Amino acid sequence: MIRGSKELIRSINCTNVLEEIINSDPISRAYLAKKLGLTKATISSIVQELLNRKLVLEIGSDETKFGRKPILLSFNQKAGYAISIDFGDTIISAALTDLKGEAAQYKSIQTPDEPQKILESLVDLIQSMEQLTATSIYGIVGITIGIHGVVHRKKITYEKHVSSNTDISNIDLINELEQLYHIPVFIENEANLSAIGEYTFKSTYENIANLNIHNSISLGMVLHNTLYTGNNGYAGSIGHMIVVPDGRTCSCGNHGCLEQYLSIPSLLKDFSDKIHVPDAKLADL
């Protein structure tokens, strides 16, 4: 039994009930009480609160041969939306998703050439996606930005060779966007976010390794149900591990880095050289 103040216990129980409805959708009040070990009175009170907040919907009765048919509860995944942004070297991509992570819209823009234009471009992108949320109860409830760099204690750092137009380490995007929209804004390494997404929506495992390969290479890890980033956030920065001593020259100044053999540009170059066709594209593979 959870001990503590009534408010804390209520909050924890409310969270547990909502999570169970999300994971077992649809579900009856009776089954919620049985699965969570809570009294029917507690379940009824919490469910009524969630119904009042429009986070849960009653969607009809369960089929049963005996007794009163239980009313089924379903998570209202359209009650709010989130925006996920991938801040790439040349393209900024955004996805608008409902509260279950199902995509409602995708958009992309060119990455601005000048850092001072980045905030304005992001605001324009976000505002262009707000229209689809007009009928939802809570609208946009959060924004997440994935970057191709390291995030540690909200501080952003990049490898020294990253081009200046993608360096947003001197822009306080979290503060700027939170002041504009009054909702939580998060910034994290894109591979870490991929790992979190895989763990949250698709995986039944407590340990996950998610490898992202594009112009660079990075690794996101969930270990024992927790995102693992290392002491300084560099745990997944594997692109500049030397795998071939005295190998190909890398933009970081070393030789034989993993990115020189497995990143998309390096794979395309190898493919172009092999088929004797300059500037091969991904579509050619």
Question: PLM ranges: what are they?
Answer:
Residues 25-58:
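N-terminal helix-turn-helix
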Residues 103, 107-123, 127-207:
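Glycine-rich phosphate-binding loop and adjoining helix at the ATP-binding site
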